[in-house]
Amino acid sequence: MSSDNRVVHVVYGSQTGNSEEIARTLLQKIQDAIAGSGSTCIVDCKPLNEWTTTYTQWNSERALVLVVCSTTGNGDAPVNACHFWRQFKKRSQPKDTLDNTRFAVMGLGDSNYDKFCNMGKQLNRRFGEMSSVPFRELCCVDEALGLEEQVDVYLEEIVPRVCRWLLRA
């Protein structure tokens, strides 16, 4: 399998901008790491709502979906992810909608609330129900402990891993 056939979708659900900023940082770090490799693989970044009608096209062993999503209100999806979530969670969807698609979810939340990282947990569960392949275990980032250090640890681990997957011949 050529790396030129591989696609990384970095998608986010963000209420206050933290998840979007993390997603864009992740995108930039991946792009910087593969620069000069000669690879023409595709790496993009969009809010989850922009993927509502196209996520069924992710169904491919050549696709990797990296989700960064915060939880808002009483365990709810952020405004730029709520339409996606309504569609994505429908039980009428075929179980193999995302067959062989790799995924990793980073959920942002605050452990002072009962539904800590609820959206990240729900998205992670739903990807699994739709026959996706975990690329990495769920990462729950606790805003009560400060985001920066936790996010840095995640990025230091996942970026090289994504690059190895992208550039694997």
Predicted features and spans:
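A generic structural signal for short, well-ordered alpha-helical segments in conserved domains
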Residues: 23-27, 124
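Short acidic loop-to-helix transition motifs that present clustered carboxylates
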Residues: 45-54
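FMN-binding flavodoxin-like domain, especially the glycine-rich phosphate-binding loop
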Residues: 2-7, 12, 17-18, 32-33, ...
